[in-house]
């Protein structure tokens, strides 16, 4: 189980990303628009830099919903591989069966 502080930090990042998502997308679009002047694009980059560091979606980490494990997490389920195996064998995940051939 991951430490609670790490999980809380992730939740805080999620909230910041959601809060600044619109601004981040606008500045990003301006900065990457080659039809704009160089000054406008440079200004947009400066504004992007002024946003909080954790407002950038690339700083988010996928974690297991049960254990908080940061690695080996399947996006489709939001669970770590060990928990998927555990729940699948117990029959708690619909549609998952053990492979046999």
From Swiss-Prot:
UniProtKB keywords: Ribonucleoprotein, Ribosomal protein, RNA-binding, rRNA-binding
Pfam families: Ribosomal_S14 (PF00253)
UniProt-listed SUPFAM superfamilies: Glucocorticoid receptor-like (DNA-binding domain) (SSF57716)
InterPro entries assigned: Ribosomal_uS14, Ribosomal_uS14_bac/plastid
A Gene Ontology cellular-component term: small ribosomal subunit
UniProt GO BP: translation
Keyword Cytoplasm: no
GO molecular function, one term: structural constituent of ribosome
NCBIfam families per UniProt: PRK08881.1
Subunit note: Part of the 30S ribosomal subunit. Contacts proteins S3 and S10.
Record function comment: Binds 16S rRNA, required for the assembly of 30S particles and may also be responsible for determining the conformation of the 16S rRNA at the A site.
Family to which the UniProt record says this protein belongs: Belongs to the universal ribosomal protein uS14 family.
Protein name stated in the entry: Small ribosomal subunit protein uS14
Organism of provenance: Polaromonas naphthalenivorans (strain CJ2)
């Amino acid at each position: 189980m991951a430490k609670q502080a790490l999980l809380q930090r992730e939740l805080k990042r999620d909230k910041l990303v959601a809060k600044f998502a619109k601004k981040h997308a606008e500045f990003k679009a301006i900065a990457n628009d080659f039809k704009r002047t160089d000054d406008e694009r440079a200004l947009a980059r400066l504004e992007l830099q002024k946003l909080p560091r954790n407002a950038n979606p690339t700083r988010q980490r996928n974690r297991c919903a049960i254990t908080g494990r940061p690695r080996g997490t399947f996006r489709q389920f939001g669970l770590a591989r060990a928990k998927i195996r555990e729940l699948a064998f117990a029959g708690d995940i619909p549609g998952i069966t053990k492979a046999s051939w």
